[in-house]
Curated annotation (Swiss-Prot):
GO terms for cellular component: plasma membrane. The keyword 4Fe-4S does not apply. InterPro entries: PEBP, PEBP-like_sf, YbhB_YbcL/LppC-like. It is found in: Cell membrane. Residues 1-27 form the signal peptide. Residues 126-145 are annotated as: Disordered. It comes from the Bacteria. The lineage of its organism: Bacteria, Bacillati, Actinomycetota, Actinomycetes, Mycobacteriales. Keywords: Cell membrane, Lipoprotein, Membrane, Palmitate, Signal. This is Putative lipoprotein LppC. CDD domains: PEBP_bact_arch (cd00865). It is a lipid-anchor. The gene is lppC. It holds the Pfam family PBP. A lipid is attached at C28 (S-diacylglycerol cysteine).
Length: 205
């Protein structure tokens, strides 16, 4: 007959082995949950709505309601008529200190002839009526030494002349060379400009 102590000693290794098995199973099974590894977190991609693009910058433009680009200039705006400036409309992008307007004739008999120069035009959009100078602008003497507009007046028999109405975008306030007029002033404006837009009208000589 075994003594109580002997029976206890025989059972102790079995109990210890059983406890170790429970601990091992608990460590492997994670409490009975899914033993697969959790995949790494991947943030969702952020997309930009392609249907709402940023607003486009306003372009530099010049036009006239009295004649289209490349079309004849009405006689009322020439020396054969009232000799007043045609109405104009224009727009410019942001960033200009001022705008400038130069009207010239590259087909003049004696070479390039500047008919009108206006500097200091307020940036942005604007318009003029017949005979008006753009807002904020002041005239620089043209090739004939005259301040203000002088319309098409080509000699007879000289063919088609092209009158260029060029609007310049000036990023800083214009400083013309002292005494600059006509072609010299027009060249200084073109060199200082960061952009230009042009309207061309024709007139027969």
């Amino acid at each position: 007959m075994e003594s109580p102590m002997t029976s206890t000693l025989h059972r102790t290794p079995l109990a210890t082995a059983g406890l170790a098995l429970v601990v091992a199973l608990g460590g492997c099974g994670g409490g009975g949950g899914d033993s697969r590894e959790t995949p790494p977190y991947v943030p969702k991609a952020t997309t930009v709505d392609a249907t709402t693009p940023a607003p486009a910058a306003e372009p530099l433009t010049i036009a006239s309601p009295m004649f289209a680009d490349g079309a004849p200039i009405p006689v009322q705006f020439s020396c054969k008529g009232a000799n007043v400036a045609p109405p104009l409309t224009w727009s410019s992008p942001a960033g200009a200190a001022e705008l400038a307007l130069v009207v010239d004739d590259p087909d003049a008999v004696g070479g390039l002839y500047v008919h009108w120069i206006v500097t200091g035009i307020a940036p942005g959009s604007g318009s003029t009526a017949d005979g008006q100078t753009p807002a904020g602008g002041h005239s620089v003497p043209n090739s004939g030494g005259r301040q203000g507009y002088f319309g098409p007046c080509p000699p007879a028999g000289t063919g088609t002349h092209h009158y260029r109405f060029t609007l310049y975008h000036l990023p800083v306030a214009l400083q013309l060379p002292p005494g600059a007029t006509g072609v010299q002033a027009a060249q200084a404006i073109a060199q200082a400009a960061s952009g230009q837009a042009r309207l061309v009208g024709t007139f027969e000589g």
